Amino acid sequence: YSEKFKYVLVDEYQDTNKAQFTLITLLSARYGNITVVGDNDQGIYSFRGADISNILNFERDFPGTKIIKLEQNYRCTGNILNAANAVIKNNTVKYKKELWTQNEVGELPNVFCGDNEYDEGSYIVEQINRLRREEYFKYQDFTVLYRMNAQSRAIEDILRRENIAYKIVGGLKFYERKEIKD
């Protein structure tokens, strides 16, 4: 079956599991033309079965591999990358790399650790209101990003309590979801 696939490309390889590794190995067996893109420092899906050893053992599993490290970051400021490098250096098993940028140093990151999701929601709204007062922003100038839709409830509850209009892009507001309305 691998005859059908002259080239195999896998994105987010750090998030692959054992079954996907086996499939990738079988599909690329005939021609050996395999390209993967991934970052061992972004492997966060072990709870879903992802196996970080897939990317860490890539050179061993696919002999003749050439690793190209993309260490220059075009989006973040220097201070954001300094914080990222400080966290990444604690990874015990990894490919060695040092992220860098030609961008400005930028502001220092602000870290808030709330006791729960409602503390986080309150903090977000407090910061929005502070910036509106001090910097004269409008509500429409703000965007709140979250990783999972389940995180929206606490933020939405606080926004509703404070009578702040908002919209959800790419989904439904928590209280408009079918399973909540029923």
Q: Model-found features: residue ranges?
A:
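Conserved helicase NTPase motor core
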Residues: Y1-N57, K69-C76
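Short, acidic/turn-prone active-site loops that include or flank metal/cofactor-
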Residues: N40-D41, G170-F174
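Short beta-strand->loop structural element characteristic of the AMP-binding/adenylate-forming
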Residues: I44-S46, A165-I168
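Glycine-/small-residue-rich beta-strand-loop submotif within the FAD-binding core of flavoenzymes
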Residues: R60
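Helicase P-loop NTPase motor core
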Residues: P63-K66, E71-Y166, K173, K178
